[in-house]
């Protein structure tokens, strides 16, 4: 690999580690010419997941968009971002395990609700109210009564 500092053609690897659940390889390299060190990452290039929106549009899955929705649902709850990231990782893994490249936003919403149900009831209700587009107090009451039965 070419050195980013001096352009020398032949650098060598001094350390290799697997990170992110063995899905990424991190390599520390050194240039024999200028002695500078740098890091490279090797990742599997995965087929992008396309999300089919309610209106039929298709757009690439956006992890940050889902994270923002989860963060809104857990505002002022004692839930850290690591748990939210783990939920997203599980959802992505589930989609990939199914071997599909397209999924509806509705299906993603259902997956999120299943994860939030186990994590935090308030976050679950908040997310459900947006996901299911509640427009009245009766819809909230219905959801809460269903939750009490379960």
Swiss-Prot record:
Domain of life, source organism: Bacteria
Per its Swiss-Prot or TrEMBL entry, what cofactor is needed? Zn(2+)
Task: Enumerate the transmembrane spans.
Answer: none
* Magnesium is among the record's keywords: no
Which residues form the unnamed zinc fingers?
A: 3-34
One GO-annotated biological process of the protein: negative regulation of DNA-templated transcription
Q: Name one GO molecular function term.
A: DNA binding
The cofactor remark states:
Binds 1 zinc ion.
- Show the Pfam families listed in the entry: ATP-cone, Zn_ribbon_NrdR
**Boundaries of each ATP-cone domain copy?**
49-139
List keywords of the entry alphabetically.
ATP-binding, DNA-binding, Metal-binding, Nucleotide-binding, Repressor, Transcription, Transcription regulation, Zinc, Zinc-finger
Kindly list any coiled-coil regions of this protein: none
Matching entries from PANTHER family are given as: TRANSCRIPTIONAL REPRESSOR NRDR
Q: Family, per the entry?
A: Belongs to the NrdR family.
Function text: Negatively regulates transcription of bacterial ribonucleotide reductase nrd genes and operons by binding to NrdR-boxes.
Q: What is this protein called?
A: Transcriptional repressor NrdR
């Amino acid at each position: 690999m070419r050195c980013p500092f001096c352009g020398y053609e032949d650098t060598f690897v001094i350390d290799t580690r697997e990170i992110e659940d063995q899905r990424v390889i991190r390599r520390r390299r050194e240039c024999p010419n200028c002695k500078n060190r740098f890091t490279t990452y090797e990742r599997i290039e995965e087929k992008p997941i396309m999300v089919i929106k309610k209106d039929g549009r298709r757009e690439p899955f956006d992890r940050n968009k889902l994270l923002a929705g989860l963060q809104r649902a857990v505002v002022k709850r004692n839930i850290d971002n690591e748990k939210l990231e783990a939920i997203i990782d599980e959802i992505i893994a589930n989609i990939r395990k199914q071997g599909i490249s397209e999924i509806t936003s509705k299906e993603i919403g259902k997956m999120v609700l299943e994860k939030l149900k186990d994590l935090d009831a308030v976050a679950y209700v908040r997310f459900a109210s947006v996901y299911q587009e509640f427009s009245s107090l009766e819809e909230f009451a219905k959801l809460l009564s269903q939750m009490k039965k379960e």
